Regions:
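N-terminal twin-arginine translocation
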Residues: 12-19, 29-42
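Conserved alpha/beta-hydrolase "acid-adjacent" motif
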Residues: 294-300
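Short, surface-exposed "cap/lid" segments of acyl-processing enzymes
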Residues: 77-81, 85-117
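Conserved acidic catalytic loop of the alpha/beta-hydrolase fold
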Residues: 148-165
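Catalytic histidine-centered segment of alpha/beta-hydrolase-like enzymes
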Residues: 321-331
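Alpha/beta-hydrolase
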Residues: 207-288
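N-terminal cap/lid segment of alpha/beta-hydrolase-fold proteins
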Residues: 42-77
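N-terminal secretory signal peptides
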Residues: 1-15, 26-29
Length: 351
């Protein structure tokens, strides 16, 4: 069930989250922050506009509230949109800290602002179990459940934007959720970029270390997160790939929204891989692999890449990049490969 323009339930906790989120977002001088679909009508045509959106999906009679965050420039969207991008977050944080990070003096770290200014209609979500979306069910919110969220969110976005397809970018376990969703709903996906992806986990030092704590994570639906854990994302593979002020802003943004996150994707990536089948992914695909990223071996990714059926596919190695590419020093490289992929023209001749 898809509910158009659904508002967040008026619980005390949800109202507090909404007030905090609105206040934090308003600090960005470069962004006009408003609520609801009326924002586009009153905003300056050259300014990035922000909107909250909500939809609901049903799981065995239980309504699941899903939060979405949209950024775009109305004038560009109305006249010459380059398409709609849905950004999908990973295991340890919700959507906005990853894709709409506000760093003082460094506006480039808001990926959504960057692509909105290029003429894209950009969206991200909080998967069930994260931040503003529902957390009430007693499950660990695994990768398959995240793909269910994407089915509901994509239907809402396509109906709202009156588009037939959207583009996807998934980071880390977000890439697995995005790929699984694209396997299930190929008709909704125009192109898909999989960053910090892993297929079987063979040869992954990160997952080898993670398996040492699988007993702990298998026994609970949530795990705590703190500043040290977030900082370790930028040091575990190759220290120095990210600036300290960006890492600190990232940690601040995450911890203002959540103090714990689901264990499901950690469990899946540790002991349940593979969860994706490359033969079923029909859309054009770009695999993005940071030079220093320890989440997957080159062999594992190349084996997956070889089995992708669409000839429109890319395997990109990003030099000087580790796991969290959108928050690192070589961000311009990441943007360059994404811009090229998302704006690639359709082939005139296909044989």
């Amino acid at each position: 069930m898809i509910v158009m323009n659904k508002k967040e339930p008026n619980t005390t906790a949800s109202l507090a989250r909404r007030r905090f989120f609105q206040a934090g977002a308003a600090l960005s001088a470069a962004t006009l922050v408003t609520q609801g679909a009326q924002a586009a009508k009153s905003a300056h045509p050259d300014k990035v506009v922000s909107q909250e959106h909500w939809t609901t999906r049903d799981s065995d009679g239980v309504p699941i509230e899903l939060f979405m965050w949209r950024k775009m420039i109305p004038g560009m969207i109305n006249k010459a949109s380059k398409g709609t991008i849905l950004f999908v977050h990973g295991s340890s944080m919700a959507g906005t800290p990853v894709f709409d990070l506000q760093v003082p003096g460094k506006p480039q770290y808001s990926t959504m602002d960057h692509f909105a200014r290029l003429g894209f209609d950009t969206w991200c979500l909080d998967n069930e179990g994260y931040c503003r979306s529902s957390k009430s069910r007693s499950i660990n919110f695994n990768i398959a459940n995240g793909a269910d969220d994407l089915a509901a969110v994509s239907a809402y976005i396509l109906k709202t934007t009156k588009q037939k397809q959207l583009m996807l970018y998934g980071l880390s376990s977000g890439a697995l959720k995005a790929a699984l969703f694209a396997e299930r709903f190929p008709e909704r996906v125009n192109r898909i970029a999989l960053d910090a992806f892993v297929w079987t986990g063979e040869g992954s030092p990160t997952l080898e270390n993670r398996r040492k704590r699988i007993g702990e994570w298998s026994g609970t639906n949530r795990r705590g997160i703190d500043r040290a854990m977030i900082q370790s994302i930028f040091t575990r593979d190759h220290p120095g790939t990210a600036d300290a002020d960006v890492v600190n802003a990232f940690a601040d943004a995450i911890l203002k929204l959540d103090s714990s996150v689901p264990t499901g994707s950690y469990v899946d990536m540790s002991i349940n891989l593979p969860v994706c089948q490359p033969e079923k992914l029909k859309a054009p695909v770009m695999i993005m692999r940071g030079q220093f990223d320890g989440i997957a071996s080159f062999k594992d990714l190349l084996n997956y890449f070889e089995k992708l059926p669409n000839p429109d596919k890319r395997f990109v190695v990003m030099p000087g990049v580790a796991h969290s590419s959108l928050h690192e020093k070589n961000l311009s490289i990441v943007y360059n490969v994404l811009e090229s992929f998302f704006q690639e023209p359709s082939p005139v001749y296909v044989g």
